[in-house]
Amino acid sequence: MEATAEAAPCVDTLGNGVITPVHNGQAGSPHVRVNWKVEGTNISITYGRPFLKGRIVGDTVEPLEDSVWRLGADEATTFSTSGDLMVGTTHVPAGTYTLWTLTSDATTRLIINAETGQWGTAYDQFRDVGRTTMTVGILATPANQLTLSIENSELRFEWGAMVASVPIMVH
């Protein structure tokens, strides 16, 4: 279900993106589309924003060790760009993709995948455009709700005490 005309966009304080509500997910996670303009290139991410609700990232909620995660709730998170990008070490041509993460051996990788339109657990590694290592840190104030943003030339996500980022630039 698409957002109604009454759903006014608001400014995302993490990266100056514009957030538009899309729908409420099956388990109550709101779904949003966030749009940014980076050096003339339009970038949007549509994803479910789950709440922790007392759960612990890596223990009782994704991302779990050695498990591919859809980087959101419900449907697979989509990432669209109107121009070619470099996301970490991965060249991403203009188009629409899905975003996933894989954490193993204390390394978190962002996966950019060419398959779109699937439910969030239907991941096909043979459709990967690329995988790139993310820089991981600890937030001073944990994020109770998953947030994806683009700021300071980085694509980042905040979830629980974790913040992970990867450089992003127009190519």
Please give the residue ranges for each predicted region.
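Primarily secretory-pathway and cell-envelope proteins
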Residues: 1-68, 116-171
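Mid-length scaffold segments of soluble, non-membrane domains
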Residues: 67-118
